[in-house]
């Protein structure tokens, strides 16, 4: 029972770190990356559909994204969706593919992105701490019901704290790496 609580907490913390990493992938760092367009949806036959389901996205050069729609009739809709997104990207359409040149980031924009990275980082840490709290609450219930002793409770909560510290250290390392990537000119 106790090991199950700790394992569940570890799995949830791992998922929180993975979600944080996916969130960071959507922040552009001056380089072209297909994940930039992950959250952009196109109105396709009345349904909001992610671009990645409507087209293949390739990166032929460091600052160029090429979007090749499977259905040429949606090219205008894809272009409109990219323009109306808050990514600040300008697509150019030649009738069969859309090219997006990724402009170099300004110093001001880099600082804004670093703030965003820090916000995502803090959100991920809060998620990990909430998971710790839930696990500790479950352990305290076991102690209250007499299933484990007070000393065992202390040992198990220390294990949960170590898990928390490890995951927060991972988040900090990922944050530092992304900040460096964003500030790189």
UniProtKB/Swiss-Prot annotation:
Gene Ontology terms, MF aspect: ribosomal large subunit binding
Full protein name: Ribosome-recycling factor
Disulfide cross-links: none
Protein biosynthesis recorded as keyword: yes
Stretches that traverse the bilayer: none
One GO-annotated biological process of the protein: translational termination
UniProt organism field: Geobacillus sp. (strain WCH70)
Family: Belongs to the RRF family.
Domain of life of the source: Bacteria
Cellular location(s): Cytoplasm
GO CC terms: cytoplasm
Primary localisation category: cytoplasm
Protein function: Responsible for the release of ribosomes from messenger RNA at the termination of protein biosynthesis. May increase the efficiency of translation by recycling ribosomes from one round of translation to another.
One Pfam assignment: RRF
Keywords, ordered alphabetically: Cytoplasm, Protein biosynthesis
